[in-house]
């Protein structure tokens, strides 16, 4: 199978070398970095290291970055595409488990979950994650314990959906929508690290705004999307 890792990156100059080193040492999968118009040295480092990189002309955000990566995967006929953060919090050693779940026909989307066998911490972000979890369960009947995880593997049909339908995004509301459409999803326990360098773009204010928009979409938009 042809497998592609999509690495969205925005101002990850201090992390991207370590991320690609982790990927190449722990897998034999192809990768593409989607540089979201970073204003640090991310682009320069990628070019100097001769990494496979796509650079957006303006900052468009995570959704557009992943969608571009999916279009790349679709155009180049990949069988599985993996979403893998560029901030160093994900560990590539878990990716073969996600791939195997798809290869074995257990699911069409495999999620690297922090909470299959572990409880969530009582932080604002995790409270928000729990609210999203409950909304997904309310609208679909299925429990996704880590709906905001950014480590996911998608099969060929899901790649096509991303590449040809702009309403399909790497967000929890799309997960809820796809569940209702009969897409099989499996969560696999993984560990994630704390960010070592740089700052997360997700401030408390942005996190609250994000949570509200996702909850609204799950309950009132994706619920009725055909």
Task: Walk through the language-model features, giving the residues of each.
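A conserved acidic beta->alpha catalytic loop
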Residues: 35-43, 88
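Acceptor/aglycone-binding surface of glycosyltransferases and processive sugar-polymer synthases
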Residues: 58-75, 80, 92-168, 194-217, ...
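Catalytic donor-sugar/metal-binding loop of nucleotide-sugar-dependent glycosyltransferases
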Residues: 143, 165-166, 176-193
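Short hydrophobic beta-strand elements that form part
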Residues: 4-8, 55
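Cell-envelope/extracellular polymer assembly enzymes that use nucleotide-activated donors
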Residues: 2-4, 173
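Acidic helix N-cap motif at the loop->helix transition within catalytic regions
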Residues: 14-18, 40-48
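Short, well-formed alpha-helical segments that are part of the catalytic scaffolds
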Residues: 11-25
């Amino acid at each position: 199978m042809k497998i592609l890792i999509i690495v969205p990156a925005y101002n990850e100059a201090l992390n991207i070398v370590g991320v690609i080193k982790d990927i190449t040492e722990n897998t034999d999968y192809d990768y593409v970095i989607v540089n979201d118009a970073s204003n640090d040295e991310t682009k320069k480092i990628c070019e100097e290291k001769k990494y496979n990189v796509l650079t957006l002309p303006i900052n468009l955000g995570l959704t557009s970055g992943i969608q571009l990566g999916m279009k790349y995967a679709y155009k180049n006929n990949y069988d599985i595409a993996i979403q893998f953060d560029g901030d160093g919090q994900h560990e590539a050693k878990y990716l073969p488990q996600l791939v195997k779940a798809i290869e074995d026909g257990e699911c069409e989307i495999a999620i690297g979950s922090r909470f299959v066998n572990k409880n969530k911490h009582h932080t604002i972000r995790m409270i928000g994650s729990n609210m999203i979890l409950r909304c997904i369960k309310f609208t679909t009947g299925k429990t996704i314990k880590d709906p905001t995880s950014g480590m996911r593997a998608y099969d060929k049909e899901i790649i096509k959906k991303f590449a040809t339908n702009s309403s399909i995004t790497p967000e929890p509301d799309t997960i809820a929508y796809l569940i209702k459409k009969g897409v099989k999803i499996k969560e696999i326990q993984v560990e994630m690290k704390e960010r070592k360098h740089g700052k997360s773009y997700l401030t408390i204010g942005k996190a609250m705004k994000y949570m509200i928009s996702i909850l609204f979409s799950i309950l009132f938009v994706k619920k009725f999307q055909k």
